Amino acid sequence: VLYAIIPVILDGVERKLKAALQSRIGPPVTQTIYDLLKLVLVKEIKTQPTILYVYLSLTSSIVTGLASLYYITLYALRGDQVDMFYALALFAITTSTHTVTPLIVPNPYSFIGGIREVVLGVVNEAALITSISLYTIMAQRSMLKSTQWVIIIAVALVALTAFIASYVASSRVPFDIAEAEPEVASGIFVEFSGSVLALNIYSLLLRRLIVKLLVLAPTVGLLYGFSLTGLLVVLLLLPATWVTYATVAVILGRSRVDVAPLTLAKIYITLILISITVLLVQAYV
């Protein structure tokens, strides 16, 4: 229940923060809750059969997302790599389902936006899964406790890759290439309104929560170990991480559709190859 409420509250905090950074008064922290309730109460305009598939797709995305959060919690408590790999697999399903949903909407603008998301997702999800898997293995072996600078560099590079990939997965500027940022949750569903938009917005917010916990859990595990205390530290760091991502989004400018995926691919390949090379050299020296 806590995980179901947190993303809605933190999104309200993010909107308030953005308004403050842009010298605006902004909406109340509870505005996102009001928006979702308002959309749920709005009567659907479209009666196309497609809307049923959209409902099923978004609902399955939310359910698998909540299941992913369950395994992340187990990982933070026990430190079992299998739990994190389950969480990554479920998150990949969540992201894939959410990403391909616009492709079944009978509207060219929605389809184009969906294709852009697919292209970006192909690049980013591979880096996210690879970096967090490496990060999890390092956390399991407590490699950060080593005083060897080579190990510290490798851990830092993997952590940097994981945090970059998690930021991109949150669909914030400049990686909101499907639509302009205010329309990330609604533009690709231009033909629908009401509860469909509410489900899509909530699915997006849930993904933003998951990607932050995916990188925070192994980070805290490296520093504090895996226990109930570690889980509490993760939850305490969550609002700060969310605010940091929101601040970065305000500072950064937009990117071209053809530039963002290619640039990300170059960055990810470079960082991951260097970190793996460093670890291999350390293992055989």
Residue locations for each model-derived region?
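Alpha-helical transmembrane segments of multi-pass membrane proteins predominantly involved
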Residues: V1-V285
